[in-house]
Regions:
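Extended alpha-helical scaffold/tether regions of large eukaryotic proteins
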Residues: 1-230
Length: 230
């Protein structure tokens, strides 16, 4: 759980932290000699605590990534298949045969544009209050997901940011999951435009009573009114 009540607590400073270093503490102005002394804790102590918290969350993170990057036989992602086939058709028309280019196209279109946004902003889907602590922690998880989808080699060293170092060991395995997901999508039976339209119509019928269109229209209007001068 990422609820503040489940975060590790520094018994001396009464501060919470999770998958990020408490840099906000270090940036605060000095108030007393004792408080200043508390802030001189070795970075290794913080790293140990971060690794401990990471271990607690590891199974949940693994399950999350597998849920995102897996295909259910009873409900294959037809829209993803149709769109990925479109990208492959565009690559073929333009004489692009480099598989890395297609990987980048697919990654930029779905994992990075959609899933990373959801990972960093769960309030878009769930009725929750995202605190600053949770926001920082979700950014670490989102970074791990981004690295998993990348094809570039991770260049890590002692000066690398903690959010990249924390999951460096798991990234190779996560990348295999991403590649397997793309391959499974590619091996699915292609859809015609008529089949895709029928699928979208069926999905619309399923949820036609789940949303308040008036509220949605009001939100769109407020958005348009706000940015109309621009």
């Amino acid at each position: 759980s990422l609820h503040p009540g489940s975060l590790l607590k520094d018994l001396d400073t009464e501060k919470y932290f999770h998958l990020v270093l408490p840099t906000d503490e270090l940036a605060e102005p000095k108030k007393s000699h004792r408080q200043s002394h508390r802030k001189k804790v070795l970075p290794e102590i913080y790293l140990t605590r971060l690794l401990s918290t990471k271990g607690t969350l590891q199974k949940f993170l693994d399950d999350l990534f597998k849920a995102i990057l897996s295909i259910r036989e009873d409900k294959p992602p037809l829209a993803v298949k149709y769109f990925f086939d479109f990208l492959e058709e565009q690559a073929e028309k333009r004489g692009i045969s480099d598989p890395d280019t297609l990987h980048i196209w697919k990654t930029n279109s779905l994992p990075l544009r959609f899933w990373v946004n959801i990972l960093k902003n769960p309030q878009f889907v769930f009725d929750i209050d995202k605190t600053d602590h949770i926001d920082a922690c979700l950014s670490v998880i989102a970074q791990a997901f981004i690295d998993a989808c990348s094809i570039s080699d991770l260049q890590l060293g002692k000066d690398s940011p903690t959010n990249k170092l924390l999951y460096a060991k798991e990234i190779p395995e996560y990348r295999k999951i991403v590649q397997r997901y793309y391959k499974q999508i590619q091996d699915m039976t292609p859809l015609s435009e008529q089949e895709m339209n029928a699928h979208l119509a069926e999905e619309s019928r399923k949820y036609q009573n789940e949303f308040n269109t008036n509220v949605a229209m009001a939100e769109i209007y407020k958005y348009a009114k706000r940015y109309r001068p621009q």
